[in-house]
């Protein structure tokens, strides 16, 4: 399964557009480690806790996007876009939304 942020794949023309597919992943963030991450963020350091949660959420959303595209018998998902949200005021979770267009290639 090909996943691409571009609307076309070089050398692989689209035969059929199958529809929009979407997926989401929610990851909790460890509050104790996140407390120390806030200090690093304040002083300009990188937050491993948040980076790990974002990476895991993005990977899970991508796998779910592939699964939903396979249900449509797609060869690829093009025009993929990721949106990140932290809905909790305390920053206790991160949500990644992934959307794209499932296509069948020639």
Swiss-Prot record:
Matching InterPro entries: UPF0145_dom_sf, UPF0145_YbjQ-like
Domain of life according to the entry: Bacteria
Pfam families, per database record: YbjQ_1
Gene3D superfamilies membership: Hypothetical protein apc22750. Chain B
HAMAP family registered for this protein in UniProt: UPF0145
Family of the protein in this entry: Belongs to the UPF0145 family.
Protein name: UPF0145 protein PSEEN3024
Species the sequence originates in: Pseudomonas entomophila (strain L48)
């Amino acid at each position: 399964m090909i996943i691409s942020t571009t609307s076309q794949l070089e050398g692989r023309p689209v035969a059929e557009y199958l529809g929009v597919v979407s997926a989401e992943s929610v990851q909790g963030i460890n509050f104790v480690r996140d407390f120390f991450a806030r200090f690093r963020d304040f002083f300009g350091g990188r937050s491993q806790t948040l980076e790990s949660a974002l990476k895991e959420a993005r990977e899970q959303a991508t796998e779910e996007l592939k699964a939903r595209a396979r249900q449509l018998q797609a060869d690829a998902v093009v025009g993929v876009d990721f949106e990140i949200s932290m809905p909790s005021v305390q920053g206790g979770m991160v949500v990644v939304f992934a959307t794209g267009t499932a296509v069948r290639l020639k």
